Structures are given as structure tokens and as C-alpha cells.
Amino acid sequence: SGKTKSIGKPLLSQYIQAGFAGFVYNYKDFDLARTAVHLVKKHNYPYGCFQISFTDMERTHRTNPIRPSVVKNETLFLQLMDDMLTAYQGKDGKRDEWFNGALGILRGVSIRFYNDYPQFCTIPHIVNFICSAGTVRITSFLEGKHQSRVLAGAFLDAKDSPKTQSSYLSSLTNSLSTLANEKKVCYVLSGNDFDFNLIDPECPKLVVVSNAYQIENLISPVISLMLSISSRRFTLANKVPFFYFLDEATTFRIADFEKLPSVLREYLCSFVFLTQSAAKIEKIYGKYDRSSIESNFGNQFFGRTKDIEALKSYPLVFGKEERQRVSKTTGSSRGGENRSRTVSTQKEEIYDTNFFTSLKSGEFVGSAAHSNMRNFHLRFEMYEDKEDPLPIVHPVLASDIEENYQQIIRDIQGIE
């Protein structure tokens, strides 16, 4: 339906021109990353613009989103560990005994890194430690501090049942082992090109995070975690106007997203959520959360779709209106010709399903809050700015990535 070029990119241009800090989610091969870099130059954007890629190591900045100096609250840090494991579990995962036991290990190990080894408190260090240490070493590590013992109580209390302990640990390592072994992801998440505090009043930032279809199951939970980290920093004291721009937003799941637009709007935060059809929201978040998400967006655009489930709901958004129907009857008999004209009024859908299947690219109907047009049916101009290829951030060799990974291994081997 042309949503990105006709609605998305013009909105992105407006946010950047207005000097908002932001988080941009890019799904299509650096498309929005190129756009953002171009717009930053075009509009003399006053803040830093950083790009994150987990596939192209020369066109990515590196950052540690869970760095203790960034996540300064222990309770928040532990909640982020919960968010990460939940994201790797998927939407159909159960928070059962095994999940809770695995989460206890993750939180117990993580809090020790946070407090005792802040220089190694990165996602790559934590997951590699958990996946390589084994039951005996992890038990000893968790017993090293009272706080970690409490958090991992279920695992430690099962000390007399090696089978139970192994089940808890394997539940965790099965979720994290692929991440621990992905050297490029470890490279990106163990660097410090910038602090992942996007609403720092002294240094606001625009960050463009790119997914990749080939490994999206691996990196989507990481991106979800990064968004959660940034969103949990907001308070009423925030003075930095901020926006989340999520193109193809249903290609990953965000913890508690149904609450975010309504809550964060009080903190100077705006959302753009683009998806191919509303039915995809329901697939990711469920029926009731979909309703909550949709109700929290004041401006809604509906374009062409042939999604059967979406076509059931789209006409309901705009309701019905009374329309006059005129029927004419003609008859003849020996006495001559008879004609009658009947006018009736009946309620019909303002836009029916056929209407939504026949919209052109860039053509949308919708409703807007606080606007001079409450409802609209328009065809928008396409964004046509010429964009340059993404610049190289750092020249990177394969040996650099390997050396970084081996350094992580050396770091965790020295931890007691």
C-alpha cells in the first residue's frame, strides 16, 4: 500500500526536522537507516545519530545497553533480564516452574555481574558465562553473594537433585546458547561507541536499529530488549521530545507494548507503528491487546489490504451512515402505463470490504485526533529524496570480531 514511502518517511522527516530524539526500527535492508542519515544531514539535526546492525560490522556502532552506568537501578536491571528471557521464549511460551527456575539463574548471575563485575556487565558476557560454566561453577558463583542466592533460590534449593538442577539450567541455556555463539551480535553489544541513554538531556540521541530477515529470530529479542531499556527510562521529569518509529512493527514482539503509547505520551513521547494489516497485531499480541494498542493511537491510516481477517474489522472502524435508495417501478395495463418512485433510507457501511481491496498505492482513509480533518480519504505523495549508501562507521576485519569474542571468553574465565 506504499505506507513507508507515503506516510512513514515523511513523518520521519518531520520528527528529525523538529529535533526529536528517537528510536527507529528498520526491517528492510537499511532502508530507513539510509533515510535517517540523509535527513540528519538535510535538516542539520542537532544530536548524534547512531546506527545498529547485527549483520554489517562496518556499518554499525557498538553499544552496551545494560551497562550499569546506563541502567542505574537494580530493580530495573532485573526486570530487563526478565524481558530478555521472555522475548526468547516467544509469545506461546509458558511461565511455568522451569521458566521461573531458569529466570532465577539468569537474574542471580546477572546481578553479580552488575554489582561485582560492572566492567563485564554486557549481554554477551552474561550469556556466555551461563552457557559455558556448568552446574558446579554456576552454583558456586550464585552462592557467592546473598542477593544472587535469593534470586536463584529454586535452582540452589535443588542441589540434592542434580536432575532438577540440570533441567533448570538447560531450560536457560537452550534459550540463550544461539545468542552466546553469535560472534557478530556479541561484537555489537560489547562495545561503547555511545551510552544507550537516548533521552540524556546533555546528549539526546537518534538510534536506528536494523533487523535482518536471515537471523531475525535471534536478534528480534535483542531489539525488543533495547526498546524496553529505552522506554523504561522515561519519567515526568523528561524534557527531551522523543519518538519511536517502528516500520513492519509486527516482525518482533515488545513486552507490555499495549501500555506504552498511552503511558509514554505523558512523558513527551510519540509513536509511529506501521504494519501490513491490523490482523498481524492480533497474531503477535492477541485479540484484546490489539484492541488496546489500536485505541491508544490517535491518528490511524488504513490502506489497501487483502487480508481476510483485516477486512472483517476495517469497515467497523468507520461505522455506518444513512443513505437514500431510490427504486423505480414501471408497469402497464389496458388502462395505460403506471410508474412509481420509492425513496427509502437505510444504514450502510461508509467503506465496505471492496473499497479496501481497491485502494491505490499511497491512498489511505483514516481518522485523526486534534486535527482539522477528523476523517479523511487522501492519496499521499511518495517520498522521493535521493539517498546515499550508509557510511562506514569503523573498518572491521573478521579477525577483529574473533578477537573480541575470544576476549569475552577470557574475561569470563577469570570470574569467580
Where are these regions (language model features)?
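P-loop NTPase motor domains
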Residues: 1-269, 284, 295, 354-416
